[in-house]
Amino acid sequence: LMNQLIESGNVYKQKFSADPRPLDPNVPSSFLQDFVFKNFMYSKQDDYEKQLTQLGIMEKDAYTCTCYMDEVGNTPAMGEVLSWSESSAVVYANSVLGARCNRNSGIIDLMGSVVGYVPRFGLLTDEGRKATWIVKIETTKKPEAQLLGSAIGMKVMADVPYIVGLDKWLGGELDDAAKTYLKDFGAATASNGAVGLYHVENITPEAVKYGKDLIAEDAKVYVVDDAELQRVYESYPVIWKKKDAKPKLCFMGCPHMSLQQLIDWTEKVSQSLKEAGRARVCIPTVFLSLIHI
């Protein structure tokens, strides 16, 4: 299909980015792993990247799930209609930036970008952006972004939540720290549920502009307190055979880390090593990001 588009001259109307590559030469791997990855699992990766170049990808390294970051440059404006399919990027664009995008399939994403149009339904409409859940945050401390997102995602599934009380822990404004928190929070709502849009009272742009007018009639209520977060935390199963097995590799950055997260985690690890009198971490650790520092 992509070759047919290229041969017919139907390239994208505007430059685009793509999701992360499956392989990174900076990640440790064995000879056998390299052989299997490059000759079997991802043998078509080079061909795929050539196709994306011909279709109009932004640049040779524009492979990230956080394309909306300022450092990347694929940042939509409020109200702009998108043809995206990466779930964590869709929920961020809708919620934090106020753009409009459905949780598209890869084919809809592809075709929408080529022709410059997408079907108008769901989260592209005013009615589809109304919240059918009110989520009340009643925790005694700032909730972990991923855990809170998981709890809300599993509860509301594909519905739109209007979140009350989280602004208390985010400082009351949409600054870089709040955006980073909401990036990780939103990704969890999208992966543990199917959330494509959330509103945070006094924080996200549509919630600031419209307030409680965004809440639909007969909206359901979900209260998140310390006990509820603990319940969700304890509900996660151990998926490996040996619970006490030693990890071989640690990955951090899904979605990709922001520049500030890279700086913060580098400082945290460096300081912890210094305090422990160690020169290296005991488990090889990879920070995932498109940004190079």
Report the location of each language-model feature.
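A generic, well-ordered mixed alpha/beta core segment in the N-terminal half of proteins
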Residues: 11, 18, 22-116
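Conserved small/polar residues in nucleotide/adenosyl-binding loops
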Residues: 291-293
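A cross-domain feature marking catalytic cores of carbohydrate-active enzymes
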Residues: 16, 202, 289
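Intrinsically disordered, low-complexity segments enriched in small residues
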Residues: 1-11, 52-60, 86-286
